[in-house]
UniProtKB/Swiss-Prot annotation:
It is an enzyme of class 2 (transferase). InterPro entries: Phosphoglycerate_kinase (IPR001576), Phosphoglycerate_kinase_CS (IPR015911), Phosphoglycerate_kinase_N (IPR015824), Phosphoglycerate_kinase_sf (IPR036043). This is Phosphoglycerate kinase. The lineage of its organism: Bacteria, Bacillati, Bacillota, Clostridia, Eubacteriales. Keywords: ATP-binding, Cytoplasm, Glycolysis, Kinase, Nucleotide-binding, Transferase. Pathway: Carbohydrate degradation; glycolysis; pyruvate from D-glyceraldehyde 3-phosphate: step 2/5. Its main location: cytoplasm. Belongs to the phosphoglycerate kinase family. Monomer. One of its GO terms (biological process) is glycolytic process. Gene3D superfamilies: Phosphoglycerate kinase, N-terminal domain. One of its GO terms (molecular function) is ADP binding. The keyword Kinase applies. Its EC number is 2.7.2.3.
Amino acid sequence: MNFNKKTIEDIEVSGKKVLVRCDFNVPLKDGVITDENRLVGALPTIKYLVEKGAKVILCSHLGKDASKSLAPVATRLSEMLGKEVVFARDEEVVGENAKKAVSEMKDGDIVLLENTRCRKEETKNIPEFSKELASLADVFVNDAFGTAHRAHCSTVGVTDYLDTAVCGYLIQKELKFLGNAVESPVRPFVAILGGAKVSDKIAVINNLLDKVNTIIIGGGMAYTFLKAQGYEIGTSLVEEDRLEYAKEMVAKAAEKGVKFLLPVDHRVAAEFKDVEATITEDQNIPVGNMGLDIGPKTETLYADAIKDAKTVIWNGPMGVFEFENYNKGTIAVAKAMADADATTIIGGGDSAAAVNILGFGDKMTHISTGGGASLEFLEGKVLPGIAALND
């Protein structure tokens, strides 16, 4: 995939109507936004376009369907920018209200369209809706990395009707850090993979085995790898149908000279509850117990590997992070990354949440804004929302 995409700074935007696809898919509780990270991430692109005298038309999805309105986002964005963001309340997204709001815009004005998923066509990338969206604007800017792996009307379809399609600052930053890490990393390059399932990370491991110096495995997926190596795992989570694959991966890593680190001890309990942990002596987990986090020896092993690295990518927690007794491994990895003299990249999703909760967010080089998108990027897949932009 070509990472050298044109950006907003490469084109003339003054006096133009610019349709910007943002990622405003934020959590709401009683109409209040509970996590504003995605709004903060969108501000640099919006501010640049406003300063350059563009007419800025923002669009985004919110939730899985039409049930939520972007009205609270318009209100909050207005406060953050210190400038009115006109909300075009319109069930058709591009209906009379939206057309009127856009026709009345002056240079530097901002309009936010209603949730793109109010239209059934959006997720099916049906040309009719793409054409309507494109008809509002002269230029398209994609700044929603979180949906770059989806070929929808507002991410890909519009580019069929607008010749100028470039990325905003957020996607530019994602391409810079994720792209460089995958294509030309400063070595040693360490990838840390956690989370519950091996099956979710198969393609990532496959792709990264050709690129990294060390792979570190934690979380529920570690037990499948350990069982494949002949260790006892008690009642821990295991994917029986992935044991053969797990064995192959470890062998493949050895063949390529890639270090493949698995836990050497564990924090375990008799059931899936936040009770005090028992720490195992070694890799084996006693009968009637399940692994819920990596143990202290493993923390040291992993921290040492991170300390020596120059590029680190992390995707997925080391244990059941929601349980206070089983968040130690995740904390240890986050701390090691925060202290490392390396380019540190958090691949969105649970790891990003963990790092922010722990207060290490500002110590990382880059926290990806897309869980699924960053995962597909690490799998080496082409992301349609980025492929559609001008080279």
